[in-house]
Amino acid sequence: MIDFEHVSKTYETHNDENVALEDINIHIDEGEFVFILGHSGAGKSTFLKLIQMEEKPTEGRVLVNGQDLTKLKRRKVPYLRRQMGVVFQDFRLIPTMTVYENVAFAMRVTNISTKKIKARVPFALSLVGLEDKMDRLPDELSGGEQQRVAVARALAHGPKIIIADEPTGNIDPEMSMDIMQLFEAINKVNITVVVVTHEHELVHKLAAKYNNLSLIHI
């Protein structure tokens, strides 16, 4: 599903080089629930950018669903990204749009038909327990509820992979566990879930609770 083969990424600066990743090898199987754990500056953001082809590795290969991203043509990048749903730490909801409109908008910009949008948005919101709040604006929701909208938005187009970038960074510990339980439920329907975080304590709590988690340090 996701493979990093001897991947290094170096950023050139004016007078120096910044090594973000060095000789990283990672294998994530289809249907896995994986935590990528690392401190600030460990290269977690670079890992995400490489998967989404926002960056290319300096050395090595990145493969997603068998596609070698180092050889993927630029015109095929949108198709790659449609296989993924991304959940951000800061939610990135549009404040003037309702819950329904936020999820629908993300589908509309990828040219999904109106018919599919009308079917998929309520379904995605029901999966995260927000079907009764479709007409609310983001500022009428709690932080945990806003993150659930972000998860629904990531799910709505039917991705094979969910990638969550520090998804508990802006919510309290109790809500963090709720969000993780939601990811576990998503994973049970054979969606690969990759959570990138620096929160060691949360990860170890979850590892004690669920026996299907995989942990990768970078």
Predicted regions: what is each one?
Residues 156-160:
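A short, proline-enriched helix->beta-strand linker immediately N-terminal to the Walker B motif
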Residues 162-165:
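Catalytic Walker B motif of ABC-type/P-loop ATPase nucleotide-binding domains
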Residues 216-218:
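Conserved small/polar residues in nucleotide/adenosyl-binding loops
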Residues 97-105:
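Short coil-to-helix segment of the ABC ATPase nucleotide-binding domain corresponding to the Q-loop/switch region
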Residues 52:
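Helix-to-loop junction immediately C-terminal to a conserved catalytic motif
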Residues 60-68:
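Conserved ABC transporter NBD signature motif
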Residues 137-141, 145-147:
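Conserved ABC ATPase signature
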